[in-house]
C-alpha cells in the first residue's frame, strides 16, 4: 500500500550511451553501441486524505437515509503510482566491402524491465447505485426487497494492478547492398527476431523464436546523374508484445466489485449496516467480470504456446525527379497489410463451449470444467490469442477436490470456433506527393500532400477511438459480439493531409519559419447495446458479455465505423530565430507561435451512445478533445 511522500509528483530519467567504431581494414568496419536508461516515476496526489473513501454515484444514495441531500466528503483520489523502468540495449555491426557488394551482419538486443508498474489503491472506493433488476445479469442478483423496494445498493471497488515484468528482444540480421551497375542498387536482407516476455516472478508467458523477416529494396538512378530516381522496398516487420501486457494479464491483479444493500451512511459517506446482494452464478463475495481476484496467474494458460507476435508486410514504390537544379518533385505509393495481431479474449463460456467443456464449479477466479471423459480442469476468464487464427490453449488439470494434479490438457481452437466471423484486418494505402526546395543558404520550402485510407477491424495495439490504451489488451476481440460489424475506417484514418513548411533568412542573423497543416476529419464510431434491429435491448442477448454500450450497433441499426467524421482542422505555426554574429552565432534567441489562429476544432468525440437499454447517453458525440490552443514559446540556447 502506497502512502503519502514528500515529493508526490516525481520523474527522473538517466541515460548513458557508449559507441565504438573501428576501421579494422580498408574494407572491414566494426561498430558497436551500448546504452542504458532508467526512468523513475512517482504520481501520488498529495491531496488524497488517508482513511477517507472515494465516493461515486452519491446522487443514488437512499433519500430515506440522507433526507435528499447526498452525504459526501472532500476525497480527491484513490490511486497512486511509484514505478521504475530500466532498459539496456546493445547493437553490433560488422561491415565488409567486397567489390560491388557491401555485406553487413549484426545483432540488435534490448532488455526492458519494469518494477512496480501499474497503480495501487490508497483508500477504499464506494459507489452507490439503484436498480430493481439484477445488478449484473447472470452473476449478481437484485438488491430490491420488501425492506428496500427501490433497490438502493452500494458496491466496494478494489482496483490494484502494480506489478513487475520484463521483455527481452534479440535479433540478428544479414544485409547485402549490391551495386549491380553504376546506377542500380539492390538491397537484400533477412532479420530474425526473438521476443521473450516474463511476468513478475520471472515466468515466460511468451517466447517467440525464429521470426524471419525478409527485406528487399532497390534504388535506380535513371539517368545516371541523380536527376531522376526510382526506388522501392518490400519487407516484413515484427512487433513484440509490450511489457504492460503483464499488468492485469500475466501477473496477478485485483479488479472486483462487492455489492451490498445498506441501512445507514457514515458521516464520511461509507455505507453501514451492510448485507451482501446474493450472487446468481453460485459464487459469493466480490465479483470480477474478468476474474481478477488477485490470485496467481497460470502463465501457460494465459498465452498459448503457439502464439504469434504482431507483424505486417509493407510495400513502397516511389520516384523523385529534379524539375530544376533546386526543385524536386516526388511521389510515393505505400501499402501496409496487417498479417497477425495479439489481443486478449475474455469470453470463458465461448471458450469452454468450443473446447467441449462443461463448467461445474468456480474457484479462485477460475471455472472448473469437465470434458466428455469427466476430466476436470481450470479455465480462466481471459487468454491472449491471435484473432483470426488458431491457438493451442493449455488447461491445468485438477482432481475431484479442485487441487492441481501437475498435468495439463492442450486443446487447439480456432477463432471461428470462438464465434468470430472474421479474422484480423487492417490495410493502409497512401499516395504521397511532394515538392521540395532544399536550403540554399537563403531559403527552403516543402509541400506534402497525402491521400490515404486506413480500413479494417483492428487499429493495432490500442483503441484510440475512445482512448483505451491497454496495449494488446483492448476491448476489441474480448468476445465475438464486440467485433460484429466492426469493419470500417479506423481511428487513424485521414483521407487528406496537406503540409507546407518553409524558412527564410531575412538577414545573416534573422531567420523566420512557418508550418501549415490542413487535415481532413477523423472517423467517428458509435457504440451501443447489441441491437442490429431485431433484438430487445432489455434482453440479455443485447449485452451477451456484460460490456454495456460497447457494440457496433446504435439505435437499432448497424453502426459502421467511420460513417461520420470530425471536422477538418487547420494549424499554422510561425517561428523567429535571432543568432547575433557577436556571439559567433552560438547564441540563439527564439520565438515560436503554435496554432497562430487559435483554431479549436473538435478532434475526438464521445462514441458511447447509451447508458442503459434505450437510454441515450447525454455525453454521446460530446467533444472530448480539441486542437491545442495557441501557445507562445520563448527560448534561449547557447552552443559550445
Locate the predicted segments by residue.
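Repeated loop/turn-to-beta-strand initiation elements of outer-membrane beta-barrel proteins
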Residues: 27-30, 101-103, 183-186, 226-228, ...
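Transmembrane beta-barrel strands of outer-membrane/channel proteins
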Residues: 32-36, 105-111, 188-192, 232-236, ...
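Gram-negative outer-membrane beta-barrel transporters
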Residues: 181, 185, 326, 332-526, ...
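Solvent-exposed loop/turn elements at secondary-structure boundaries
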Residues: 200, 206-209, 213, 217-419, ...
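C-terminal beta-signal and adjacent terminal beta-strands/loops
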Residues: 326, 339, 346, 453-455, ...
Amino acid at each position: 500500500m502506497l502512502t503519502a511522500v514528500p515529493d508526490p509528483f516525481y520523474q527522473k530519467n538517466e541515460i548513458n550511451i557508449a559507441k565504438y567504431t573501428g576501421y579494422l581494414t580498408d574494407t572491414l568496419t566494426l561498430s558497436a553501441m551500448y546504452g542504458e536508461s532508467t526512468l523513475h516515476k512517482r504520481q501520488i496526489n498529495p491531496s488524497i486524505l488517508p482513511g477517507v473513501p472515494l465516493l461515486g454515484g452519491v446522487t443514488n444514495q437512499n433519500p430515506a437515509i440522507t433526507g435528499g441531500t447526498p452525504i459526501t466528503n472532500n476525497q480527491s483520489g484513490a490511486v497512486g503510482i511509484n514505478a521504475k523502468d530500466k532498459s539496456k540495449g546493445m547493437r553490433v555491426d560488422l561491415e565488409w566491402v567486397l567489390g560491388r557488394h557491401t555485406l553487413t551482419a549484426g545483432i540488435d538486443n534490448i532488455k526492458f524491465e519494469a518494477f512496480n508498474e501499474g497503480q495501487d489503491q490508497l483508500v477504499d472506493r464506494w459507489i452507490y447505485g439503484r436498480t430493481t433488476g439484477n445488478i449484473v445479469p447472470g452473476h449478481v442478483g437484485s438488491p430490491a426487497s420488501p425492506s428496500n423496494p427501490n433497490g438502493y445498493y452500494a458496491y466496494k471497488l478494489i482496483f490494484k494492478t502494480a506489478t513487475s515484468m520484463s521483455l527481452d528482444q534479440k535479433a540478428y540480421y544479414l544485409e547485402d547492398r549490391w551495386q549491380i551497375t553504376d546506377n542500380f542498387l539492390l538491397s537484400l536482407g533477412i532479420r530474425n527476431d526473438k521476443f521473450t516476455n516474463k511476468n513478475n516472478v520471472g515466468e515466460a508467458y511468451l517466447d517467440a523464436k525464429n521470426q524471419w523477416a525478409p527485406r528487399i529494396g532497390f534504388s535506380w538512378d535513371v539517368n545516371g546523374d541523380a536527376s531522376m530516381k526510382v526506388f522501392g522496398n518490400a519487407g516484413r516487420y515484427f512487433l513484440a508484445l509490450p511489457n504492460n501486457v503483464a499488468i492485469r494479464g500475466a501477473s496477478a491483479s485485483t479488479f472486483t466489485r462487492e455489492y451490498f444493500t445498506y441501512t445507514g451512511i457514515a458521516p464520511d459517506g461509507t455505507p453501514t449496516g451492510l448485507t451482501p446482494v446474493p450472487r446468481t452464478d453460485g459464487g459469493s463475495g466480490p465479483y470480477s467480470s474478468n476474474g481478477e481476484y488477485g490470485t496467481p496467474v497460470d502463465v501457460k494458460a494465459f498465452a498459448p504456446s503457439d502464439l504469434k507476435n504482431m507483424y505486417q508486410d509493407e510495400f513502397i514504390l516511389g520516384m523523385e525527379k529534379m524539375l530544376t537544379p533546386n526543385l524536386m518533385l516526388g511521389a510515393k505509393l505505400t501499402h501496409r497489410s496487417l498479417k497477425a495481431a495479439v489481443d486478449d479474449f475474455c469470453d470463458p463460456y465461448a471458450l469452454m463451449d468450443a473446447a467441449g467443456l462443461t463448467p461445474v464449479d468456480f474457484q479462485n477466479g477460475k471455472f472448473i470444467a469437465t470434458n466428455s471423459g469427466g476430466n476436470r480442469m481450470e479455465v480462466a476468464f481471459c487468454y491472449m490469442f491471435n484473432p483470426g487464427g488458431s491457438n493451442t490453449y493449455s488447461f491445468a488439470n485438477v482432481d475431484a477436490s479442485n487441487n492441481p494434479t501437475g498435468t495439463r490438457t492442450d486443446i487447439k481452437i480456432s477463432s471461428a470456433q470462438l464465434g468470430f466471423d472474421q479474422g484480423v484486418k487492417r490495410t493502409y494505402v497512401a499516395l504521397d506527393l511532394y515538392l521540395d526546395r532544399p536550403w540554399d543558404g537563403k531559403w527552403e520550402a516543402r509541400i506534402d500532400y497525402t491521400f490515404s485510407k486506413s480500413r479494417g477491424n483492428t487499429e493495432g495495439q490500442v483503441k484510440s477511438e475512445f482512448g483505451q490504451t491497454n496495449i494488446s489488451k483492448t476491448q476489441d476481440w474480448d468476445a465475438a459480439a464486440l467485433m460484429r460489424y466492426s469493419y470500417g475506417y479506423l481511428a487513424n484514418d485521414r483521407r487528406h493531409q496537406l503540409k507546407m513548411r518553409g524558412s527564410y533568412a531575412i538577414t545573416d542573423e534573422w531567420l523566420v519559419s512557418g508550418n501549415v497543416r490542413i487535415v481532413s476529419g477523423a472517423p467517428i464510431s458509435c457504440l451501443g447495446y447489441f441491437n442490429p434491429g431485431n433484438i430487445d435491448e432489455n434482453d440479455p442477448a443485447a449485452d451477451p458479455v456484460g460490456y454495456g454500450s460497447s457494440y457496433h450497433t446504435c439505435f437499432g441499426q448497424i453502426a459502421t465505423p467511420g460513417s461520420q467524421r470530425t471536422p477538418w482542422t487547420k494549424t499554422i505555426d510561425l517561428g523567429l530565430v535571432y543568432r547575433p554574429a557577436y556571439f559567433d552565432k552560438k547564441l540563439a534567441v527564439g520565438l515560436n507561435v503554435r496554432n497562430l489562429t487559435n483554431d479549436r476544432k473538435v478532434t475526438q468525440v464521445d462514441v458511447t451512445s447509451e447508458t442503459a437499454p434505450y437510454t441515450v447517453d447525454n455525453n454521446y458525440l460530446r467533444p472530448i478533445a480539441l486542437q491545442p490552443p495557441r501557445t507562445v514559446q520563448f527560448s534561449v540556447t547557447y552552443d559550445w
